[in-house]
């Protein structure tokens, strides 16, 4: 989810952050025992190059944008940075249980992600932007390749917590490389999710 006006959920969380990060955090932790029991499991977090839009790390004091001017791009970038940090810390915590995790930039893919922006364009610009998008953006099939690579490539079985793009390990932004930041996000997310679900996070 991306590029929508600031919206609060019934849990009083900002919608983009809840859908893109907190929901993933909750679901993955609900499944963790099943993943461990299955053996040699993998979790792939779909992040984005947009994580690099966040220069100074996550702002834990204002995740709902109550105190600052809401930015659609920053909210999306924050959630994608959180995906990388979550994959990093999840991998560290669960590698001994046989679970591997990866974060992925799938590429700039022609999807409905920017539909809210498209719907606000002048009518005469819509066919122009649609045409240009078809020329320069990846197809969904192309965008799925790095995700599938991380999910099934045998050569990755000993790796965990890494960031991939174009089916190769890439170096994410400085903020996304911090193990301390990954642990901080984990604890923060555990506290938030713990208020919503009785889940015991490990």
Regions found by a protein language model. Give the residues of each.
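Rossmann-fold NAD(P)H-dependent dehydrogenase/reductase core
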Residues: 1-122, 193-202
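Alpha/beta-hydrolase superfamily serine-hydrolase fold, recognizing
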Residues: 2-4, 173, 180
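A short, mixed-charge helix-start or loop-turn motif at secondary-structure junctions
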Residues: 10, 68, 72, 129-133, ...
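C-terminal helical subdomain
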Residues: 79, 103, 127-170, 179-183
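Generic recognition of well-ordered alpha-helical segments
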Residues: 89, 146-149, 188
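Short glycine/threonine-rich loop-to-helix capping motif typified by GTGT followed
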Residues: 115, 175-176
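Intracellular terminal tails of multi-pass secondary transporters
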Residues: 177-202
């Amino acid at each position: 989810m991306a590029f929508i006006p600031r919206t609060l959920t019934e849990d009083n969380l900002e919608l983009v952050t809840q859908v893109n990060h907190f929901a993933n955090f909750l679901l993955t932790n609900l499944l963790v025992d099943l993943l461990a029991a299955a053996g040699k499991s993998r979790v792939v977090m779909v992040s984005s190059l947009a994580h690099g839009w966040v220069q100074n790390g996550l702002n834990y004091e204002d995740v709902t944008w109550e105190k600052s001017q809401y930015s659609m791009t920053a909210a999306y970038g924050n959630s994608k940075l959180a995906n990388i940090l979550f994959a990093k810390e999840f991998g560290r915590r669960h590698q001994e249980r046989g679970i591997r995790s990866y974060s992925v930039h799938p590429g700039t893919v022609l999807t409905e992600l920017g539909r809210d922006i498209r719907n606000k364009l002048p009518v005469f610009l819509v066919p122009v932007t649609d045409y240009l998008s078809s020329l320069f953006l990846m197809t969904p099939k192309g965008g799925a390749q790095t995700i599938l690579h991380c999910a099934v490539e045998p050569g990755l079985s000993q790796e965990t917590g890494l960031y991939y793009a174009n089916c190769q390990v890439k170096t994410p932004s400085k903020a996304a490389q911090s193990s301390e930041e990954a642990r901080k996000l984990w604890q923060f997310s555990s506290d938030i999710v713990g208020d919503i679900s009785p889940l015991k996070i490990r």
